[in-house]
């Protein structure tokens, strides 16, 4: 099994699941036990500033205007739990280095740093995550539910949320609408 860590999963057009339809998921972990990822293209309608106020992390949070300023739905698993995908800046509590250029943090201290001089340069705040049990993701890939591509910082941090699925499909180099959703058919 080849690990898909640091890859994007792109939902096939035939995936009509209301939660994952046209989703792009960054795979944080993928091993023999399963996989874990964060959906990167579904804002939930709340700004990071509002979240910081609700969590009482800042009384008057600075306006955070980067693309990471909206809170995203990361996935259906533990939607009350926050995850921050970010460029390395400092080491916060509960930080995991995913690559040399990307970390995942689940502690409140990284949220407190947002809008300050110690904030990561680029970040995504998400609630919940997408998870797969042992061999589940491999089965879904075999069923043509997902396509995968290597992750890029540009798609992760510099592309508007609503454009991420289209940009990801364009990076495949072919028209995704021409693919069959049936295994073994082109």
From Swiss-Prot:
This is UPF0301 protein Ssed_1237. The lineage of its organism: Bacteria, Pseudomonadati, Pseudomonadota, Gammaproteobacteria, Alteromonadales. InterPro entries: AlgH-like. Gene3D superfamilies: VC0467-like. Coiled coil: none annotated. It comes from Shewanella sediminis (strain HAW-EB3). HAMAP family: UPF0301. It comes from the Bacteria. Belongs to the UPF0301 (AlgH) family. PANTHER family: UNCHARACTERIZED PROTEIN YQGE (PTHR30327), UPF0301 PROTEIN YQGE (PTHR30327:SF1). One of its GO terms (cellular component) is cytosol.
């Amino acid at each position: 099994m080849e690990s898909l860590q640091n890859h994007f999963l792109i939902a096939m057009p035939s995936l009509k699941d209301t939660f994952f339809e046209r989703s792009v998921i960054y795979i944080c972990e993928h091993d023999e036990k399963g996989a874990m990822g964060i959906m990167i293209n579904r804002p939930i309608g709340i700004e990071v500033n509002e979240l910081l106020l609700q969590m009482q992390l800042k009384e008057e949070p600075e306006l955070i205007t980067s693309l990471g300023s909206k809170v995203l739905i990361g996935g259906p698993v533990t939607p009350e739990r926050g995850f921050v995908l970010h460029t390395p800046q400092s080491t916060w509590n509960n930080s995991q280095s995913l690559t040399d250029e990307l970390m995942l943090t689940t502690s409140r201290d990284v949220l407190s740093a947002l809008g300050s001089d110690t904030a990561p340069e680029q970040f995504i705040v998400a609630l919940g995550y997408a998870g797969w049990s042992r061999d589940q993701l491999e089965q879904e890939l075999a069923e043509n539910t997902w396509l995968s591509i290597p992750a890029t910082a540009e798609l992760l941090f510099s592309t508007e949320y609503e454009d991420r699925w289209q940009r990801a499909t364009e990076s495949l180099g072919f028209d995704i609408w021409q693919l069959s959703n049936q295994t073994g058919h082109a």
